[in-house]
Amino acid sequence: MKKNYYALAYYHFTRVDNPQEEIALHKELFKKLDVSCRIYISEQGINGQFSGYQPDAEYYMNWLKQRPGFSNVKFKIHHIEENIFPRATVKYRKELVALGCDVDLSNQGKHISPKEWHEKLEENRCLVLDVRNNYEWKIGHFENAVLPDIQTFREFPEYAEQLSKEHDPETTPVMMYCTGGIRCELYSSLLLEKGFKEVYQLDGGVIAYGQAMGTGKWRGKLFVFDDRLAVPIDEADTDVSPIAQCSHCEASCDTYYNCANTDCNNLFICCEECIHSTKGCCSQECSQAPRIRSFSTSRGNKPFRRMHLCEISEEQEKPLSCCLR
């Protein structure tokens, strides 16, 4: 009998006096459950990506909401067929979003619902910022959105400063979005510090928009940091036209692979024909390398376990080399 699984995305900023205790409690609980995850906990709160057998996932959601400080955590749920992380990983991270500077979380952009977001996109009077990575943007983004020209998220404060010089903060309304919402919590605050008077952030991120509005103003797929790599934002509409291109032949494609060359492991976009001809590698040079992992289409585009993508945070310090392709 086929089992039903949930994929959960969630975060919550709250004071955590003893992060190591929370980590230990999570690890002990997960020993008893059919789950996998990548969860970061710090004095700032929690940021989690999680998958689990449906009853176990529901148990965890109820359990976490009973923990001190986490009663208001909001979970975004996708229905999946299996666990999507290689293991249950729960770690300490000083910054839930790697930014390298202090941010006043009491001063944030206005959270607007997916419906309000959609209406503002139709009005087309705001500067729309996509505050994700380049490789996320490549396969999907909102119409008319701008991708900041930065290589790491630590460069965003400098970008915000430059933005305030290129656009009048007094008269330029700004809308920003990310996958689940956590990055906007910090970046909207930075824009307000730079004098922008009207800053909006998509409540719940692209995930919430897809669940509430369907595909709407979104184009392409949503990059996710797990074995799936890319998903339609609307679970009911999986027939999505690619907006990206194969890195080898430039055919329309949005399938990510990580290179079969162990010493490379680059994340790259590739079509079905080219992935065969290159033995699962990102270049001809890599296809002739001495340490090539066995590639088979039977495994789909599931990442190789070494340097697994789900162990690379969406707020990572260094961009994947695929960003330069």
Swiss-Prot record:
Family statement drawn from the similarity comment of this UniProt entry: Belongs to the TrhO family.
Function as written in the Swiss-Prot or TrEMBL entry: Catalyzes oxygen-dependent 5-hydroxyuridine (ho5U) modification at position 34 in tRNAs.
Molecular function via GO: oxidoreductase activity, acting on paired donors, with incorporation or reduction of molecular oxygen
Any Gene Ontology biological process: tRNA modification
Keyword Protein biosynthesis: no
SUPFAM superfamilies: Rhodanese/Cell cycle control phosphatase (SSF52821)
Enzyme Commission code: 1.14.-.-
Keywords annotated in UniProt: Oxidoreductase, tRNA processing
Protein name: tRNA uridine(34) hydroxylase
PROSITE patterns in alphabetical order: RHODANESE_3 (PS50206)
S-S pairs: none
A Pfam family hit: UPF0176_N
Species annotation: Chlamydia felis (strain Fe/C-56) (Chlamydophila felis)
